Amino acid sequence: MTSLASSSQLPGSCRTLPGEGTQVHPRAPLLQILKVAGAQEEVFTLKEVMHYLGQYIMMKQLYDKQRQHIVHCHDDPLGELLEVGSFSVKNPSPVYEMLKRNLVILNNSDAAKNLSVGKDSNESPSEDPGQVSSGSINSAQPLIAGSSSTGTTQSCSQRRPRDPDEDSSDGLPRSACKRPKLDVTLEEWDLSGLPWWFLGNLRSNYTRRSNGSTDIHTNQLSPGQDEDTAIVSDTTDDLWFLNEAESEQVSVEIKEAVLEQGSDGESPHEDEDTGKDSKDDGKMQEEQEEDSQCLSDDTDTEISTQDAWQCSECRKFNTPLQRYCMRCWALRKDWYKDCPRLVHSISVPDIPACSSRPERDEDEEEEDDDGIDMPDCLRTVSDPVVLPSHRVSRNIPSSSASSSKGKGPSQIHHHFQETSEGDSQDTLDMETEYQPEALLEPCKLCRVRPRNGNIIHGRTAHLITCFPCARKLHKFHAPCPGCGQVIQKVIKTFIA
């Protein structure tokens, strides 16, 4: 650094970077600490002082293993210099004060150097490790300077609260002196420093970047922070392990939200077999996506918009696969409504004994030999005769008059048995005709969608819910609403 005889040479001194050619001599206590860290000389640059301080803290393992930004030095010579038992890297003011007291600048022949160094020390710490060390160490120079630099340092301290955009006494802006310091990046340092602090605060250092820079904030670094931090300036792809815990928290929150949403759809017994639930949930999520794609009514490529039918009540267009309007639940007009119902037929063949019974009764009336009727074939109770109701109704009136004339009670009982069996068959037909009407009712759970979700358990199934509700029941391992059995599979049924 050149000597300064007048104030006109101040800009040149301000542009001198800290740590470049500035030789400092530590006092005896600090020098002893630096030699323990591996220093062999007695004159250092600012970078070398910071390097050996970091090596000393690493060698003695003074940092806290859990909270790595805290350094404990109460039983160490470093603590005697700092006059504190412990300090945090986030608040390195004790280190600044120690460096002011224990560093002496060499080759300090005039007041210009003291002025430039004093201006550097009065500024607040900047956003890289170089500025931490240089700003803190140079602040000690006004304390050890000669009396000739007193006036200039006072003028520099008076200009401290001024805005950076204001001009200094020589006509140049103050930012001209600060700009070289802001350009000092991690690439100018060697591969050494405080890796324990860097690794512990790597996440916060990168998340606080708004301009994409990988430089580390000063208020998060120790004064021993030096060259080793440059090794990660271009290794942003290796930071995957830092976001692993956050991704696990997000997945847990998503799973909890899905469980809360499913619990609103009447799904009891959700806590059964929790060990299998975690494995089945992943499979069910994939199956749900596949089901929604292959079982959706809109995935049929052969059905076009021209085939859609319009509801006569609410004027909504529906797909031709649905016979009910999805909005008002009205039946589609002319949906097989006028077609006659088929008569339920019975596969039992006609029995000639019943059809020929009236003729035989007339023949037996003409005969006066036997007064007791003995029918040839009387069926037992275990093998009943089931005939259509209309045939029984025709046979009974024609034979009622003749059978009442002198016939035994067995034949009369037989006719009444046939009549009762015909009535029971009529009730059976009515029940079978009523069962399809139950399918017209909406879902038992949501009361909105049609019953198209077939819940299968074993060799039986129940069609009492819609397909979305049935999938929710299967997903959350709820029993069948109809019988309480375990749901094995859910399929979508198209009723036409």
Swiss-Prot record:
Residues 1-11, 131-141, 210-223 have a biased composition (Polar residues). A motif (Nuclear localization signal) lies at residues 448-451. It comes from the Eukaryota. A zinc finger (RING-type) spans 443-484. Residues 275-286 have a biased composition (Basic and acidic residues). GO terms for molecular function: ubiquitin-protein transferase activity; zinc ion binding. A zinc finger (RanBP2-type) spans 305-334. The keyword NAD does not apply. Residues 146-158, 397-410 have a biased composition (Low complexity). Its main location: nucleus. PANTHER family: MITOCHONDRIAL UBIQUITIN LIGASE ACTIVATOR OF NFKB 1, PROTEIN MDM4. This is Protein Mdm4. The gene is mdm4.
